[in-house]
Amino acid sequence: MNADGPVVNVHVLFFAKSRELANTPRSTVDVPTEITANELLDHLVSKFGLISIRDNLILAHNESYIDNLSDRILFKEGDELAVIPPLSGG
């Protein structure tokens, strides 16, 4: 992750298997104010040990799903990021 520009602190919420692997329901991370979803995902996977579910994760920024990993995300201080693995059940 390239953090040459401005950096902000965002709140990260983990759900289901991502919560188990990260060993926490929530955390904070410093991220650039502009980053691709793919770069962000790689950073979170590395920082929180999510490699085993990386290809199945869904990210949501301020309660809006990120549909395309090539999308650029613009963060402001205190934004919220959710890390959501697919849920199963019946």
Curated annotation (Swiss-Prot):
Keyword terms of this UniProt record: Cytoplasm, Molybdenum cofactor biosynthesis, Nucleotide-binding, Phosphoprotein
Residues bearing the modification Glycyl adenylate: 90
Pfam family, one: ThiS
Principal place of residence: cytoplasm
SUPFAM superfamilies in the cross-refs: MoaD/ThiS (SSF54285)
Pathway: Cofactor biosynthesis; molybdopterin biosynthesis
1-thioglycine: residues bearing it: 90
A biological process from GO: Mo-molybdopterin cofactor biosynthetic process
PTM entry text: C-terminal thiocarboxylation occurs in 2 steps, it is first acyl-adenylated (-COAMP) via the hesA/moeB/thiF part of MOCS3, then thiocarboxylated (-COSH) via the rhodanese domain of MOCS3.
Subcellular location(s) of the protein: Cytoplasm
Molecular functions (GO terms): molybdopterin synthase activity; nucleotide binding
GO CC annotations, alphabetized: cytosol; molybdopterin adenylyltransferase complex; molybdopterin synthase complex
Family, as annotated: Belongs to the MoaD family. MOCS2A subfamily.
Assembly: Heterotetramer; composed of 2 small (Mocs2A) and 2 large (Mocs2B) subunits.
Other noteworthy facts: This protein is produced by a bicistronic gene which also produces the large subunit (Mocs2B).
Function comment: Acts as a sulfur carrier required for molybdopterin biosynthesis. Component of the molybdopterin synthase complex that catalyzes the conversion of precursor Z into molybdopterin by mediating the incorporation of 2 sulfur atoms into precursor Z to generate a dithiolene group. In the complex, serves as sulfur donor by being thiocarboxylated (-COSH) at its C-terminus by MOCS3. After interaction with Mocs2B, the sulfur is then transferred to precursor Z to form molybdopterin.
Name this protein carries in UniProt: Molybdopterin synthase sulfur carrier subunit
Organism whose genome encodes this protein: Drosophila sechellia
This protein's encoding gene: Mocs2A
